[in-house]
């Protein structure tokens, strides 16, 4: 057991089924891959994955503080960092392809701005962008329509709010679609990543300089290509 004086920094990872690792039957998801990689580095922060399937911005905003303030070693100190990965569920349109979104872009932008303002007063915050979806297999669960145009609009306001809050932001949506085989990274439901998708996201995250710098890791060797 660790002593009271040698508790490492913690990285809280908050979000939805992506954080949970849904779809990755090989390694448990990109967050689990990150956790295991850092576990093998003695000086790296401890990763706490706190993803809940179906969560959107409002759900995360309601639970983010109580997730860590009363748990184990976390109840005695504020975590050093928080990685936020949420928003895809908010883009879904309900009932039909032109139905109302779970949360419209303006409301999402306002809510994210408020949430980042709260979070950044307590810890270093990082934000992940949104992954693409396979529109051809919609609707999800028979009633939710996801569209890449809506996801792109949502990610754009995420980037804007992060710039205003001076929070590192890692875009995902366009970068994912630029990969020729990205559709093979999807689960049959069209919204969740499979093991290959989680691997790509994890490798992209591993190269992200702001997170590596905060974690005290050496700069990524850019001569090493991403392999699938």
Describe each region flagged by the PLM.
Residues 1-53, 58-59, 65-78, 82:
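Serine-esterase "nucleophile elbow" of acetyl-processing enzymes
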Residues 6-7, 39-43, 61-228:
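Alpha-helical cap/lid subdomain in secreted, periplasmic
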């Amino acid at each position: 057991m660790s002593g009271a004086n040698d508790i490492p920094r913690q990285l809280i990872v908050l979000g939805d089924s992506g954080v949970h690792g849904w779809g990755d039957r090989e390694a448990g998801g990109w967050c689990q891959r990150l956790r295991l990689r850092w576990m093998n580095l003695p000086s790296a922060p401890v990763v706490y994955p706190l993803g809940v399937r179906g969560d959107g911005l409002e759900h995360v905003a309601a639970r983010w503080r109580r997730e860590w303030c009363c748990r184990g070693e976390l109840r005695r100190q504020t975590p050093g960092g928080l990685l936020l990965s949420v928003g895809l569920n908010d883009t879904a349109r309900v009932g039909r392809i032109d139905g109302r979104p779970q949360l419209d872009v303006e409301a999402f932008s306002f809510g994210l701005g408020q949430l980042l303002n709260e979070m950044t007063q307590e810890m270093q915050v990082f934000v992940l962008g949104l992954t693409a979806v396979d529109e051809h297999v919609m609707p999800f669960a028979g009633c939710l329509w996801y569209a890449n145009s809506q996801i792109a609009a949502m990610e754009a306001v995420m980037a804007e709010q992060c710039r205003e809050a001076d929070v590192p932001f890692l875009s995902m949506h366009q970068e994912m679609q630029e990969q020729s085989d990205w559709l093979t990274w999807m689960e049959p439901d069209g919204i969740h990543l499979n093991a290959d998708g989680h691997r790509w996201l994890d490798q992209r995250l591993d190269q992200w300089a702001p997170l590596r710098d905060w974690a005290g890791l050496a700069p990524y060797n850019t001569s090493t290509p991403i392999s699938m």
